[in-house]
Amino acid sequence: MLNRRALLRNSAAGAAVLLLPQATARAAALRDGRFRQGVLSGDPTPDGITLLTVLDDVEGKGSVALEVATDSAFRKVVARKSIATSAAAGWSVKARVTKLKPHERYYYRFETKGSHSPVGRFQTALPADSNETVRFAFFSCADYTHGYYNAYQLMAREDLDFVVCLGDYIYAESYHAKGKTGVRDDKIGKTNSDNPGIVREAVSLADYRAKYALYRSDKLLRDLHAKFPMVATWDDHEVQDNYAGHAPRGGLDASKHYTAARKAAGYKAFLEAMPFLQTGRSRIYRALRFGKNVDLVMLDQRQYRDDQPCGDATVPPCPGFDAPRDYLGRSQLDWAKRRLASSGAAWKVIGNQAMMMNAELPGGNYYGFDSWQGYVTEREELLDRGDHRRGLLG
């Protein structure tokens, strides 16, 4: 049990804890709450990490204790802090811990007066001058109803530095019902008679928050998070299938019931639920360096894009399909070009949410234009640079 005196010793513990926006207010320690969603770490740097948990079964507002140590028994504590949370933040508890040692393993836990979280662990990133091998795995498109999370169990057995989520961590829509086309049920959200292929879909902030709780009810996912840091981005299903964030009505027809409020709810739930180093109100594109070998460039391919060409259909390229249109948006595209051009890493890894290459089907049809193949002008501008092609993966 962490006590007030121990928390006040934080300044002498060795590491520093930066409280993220939802955790800046003073609050008394919470007496209740459960940690059913487990613990998460993310965006490791040589000297820092973001730590997160989300409380259940709690009311009012208050604070949660965070403790970071170099051993699993917490005899060698390097950081302690009390973090405020409330219903307005979805009971998300998030902090950035800094002044850590490069490529070191640490352990962490959260606690209220009546409950404590599982213990998580993480390893900070390699220092800039390190030539050591970097090991990571990635996942995406994790529809809860469509299959079990056995792959997470296999990942957790590996010796990894971190894992990458390339988007679709949740699915706002449930397309499958247990016993029919699905292996388990997701009954969150509302039905939409205009979309008979969808069983239910999230439309409110409460719905989107409930999605993260449902997906993390799977022990294999919680165990993966407790073992490795995650570097995450979003794709479309964190809001709505195939929406285009910079297009009127999301580029969707009226039957999809897309609204700006729905997008805002999806974004807020994601920002509450994911352990990453946020650099702006809703900016999630960023880059992380791992020694001399890996520069991981995480993109946002939803928020700034224009509508897909050709009605986003599975058809041959239509007239004007290769006309200039935004996919990353000018600011992000210029940032990515500068980062790739200036990176001296052996491998420059692009965190893509959709395929970079064309997906041409028999008969000359393209498998939709939601990916880079619908935004060829930006793709060519990003890749048509000899100074950063060497060692480029995406």
Set out the residue ranges of the language-model regions.
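N-terminal secretory signal peptides and thylakoid transit peptides that target proteins
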Residues: M1-A15
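Long, structured stretches of catalytic cores involved in phosphate-ester chemistry, encompassing
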Residues: L2, R26-V93, L100-G394
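C-terminal segment of classical bacterial N-terminal signal peptides
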Residues: L20-T24
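Terminal low-complexity, poorly structured segments
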Residues: G14-A16, R26, R96
